[in-house]
Amino acid sequence: MKIKKHIKVLVCIIISAVMFISCTNNDIADEGNENEQPNENIEQPNDEPIPASVCYTANESGSISVIDLETNKVVDTIKTDGVTHNVQVSPDGKILAATIAIPLVENTEMHENGKVLFYDTSSNELINQVEVGKHPAHVEFSRNGKYAVVANNQDNTASIIDMQNYTVINTIETGEGPHGLRIARDSILVYVANMGEDSISVLSLVNFSNISKKVIGKTPVTTAVSPDDRIILASLKGEDALAIYDMSSGNIDKVPVGKGPAQVYMQSDGNYAYVANEGTEESPSNSISKVNLGTKTVEANIEVGNGAHGVVVSDDNKFVYVTNKYDATVSVIDNSTNEVIATIPVEKEPNGITLK
């Protein structure tokens, strides 16, 4: 009898243990399932581009116009102390850089060392300034935010500015007459248009050197880089053309555009490029050439103001903004219709343009 009693107790213990383990496993499984459920309170990442809210123009008359893109009106004018040639907003949207050229003698082409002014975009107040080379043309931020690179047109150099402490940490020799530049998305290579020798210099932000040079065409003014860093564009003022350089094959195709092309800008998806056709002061052009980069043809020539110079496209590719140098205006183009929907008066001689 005692043996049977012990067996019954043992069976009860085993059954209880099995039930306990089963319940415990179910609880763990339920807890795991709960953890796998999405938390609606956590904001999910959004890959959609944020529409631009502010536009800045570099006015060579000595100012920066600040345009509210909700109203397409100038809401502020920042006075500078020299020829304001180009502007660029940092990748995080917090800093505006502007290149300032300082002529040695009024109304001459000879310059002393220029500078880059840095502004807080939340207040439009000056936060720092850095001396660079003679006649600084374009300034561009690396995508990682570490550097600002400046093309010094009369020094044949590029200044590398460390954005942590606002100091020039290196000066790299380029070709003759560097002007427009763009930095690859990997923040490693810089492509500089050398107006004086028909070439593009490729600079390294790793070892701060000029690693190569490519003959691209007559009088390249500015460059653009495709999203995959494989295609380089250059506006060729001396040929009235857009050069399309495929770095993987080495081929260069040229697309005829308007007279005296100045800046070129590529859509964020790499499908189209926009070339501002400036012409000359005596015979200004007034168009934007919209180039299909797949077919390498001009799909539209859009009439804007006289002396179209600077061009930028919103990240969502809905709008194109153009500075009209000889009209002192900015044209706003609806990219879906290729029509100008607004013309905004700014200060005299608007040149570079950027969005925040």
Segment roles from a protein language model:
Residues 14-17:
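Alpha-helical transmembrane segments
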Residues 19-22:
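C-terminal motif of bacterial Sec signal peptides marking the signal peptidase cleavage site
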Residues 24-356:
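Predominantly soluble domains enriched in secretory-pathway, periplasmic, or organellar proteins
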Residues 2-10:
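Bacterial N-terminal signal peptides that target proteins for export
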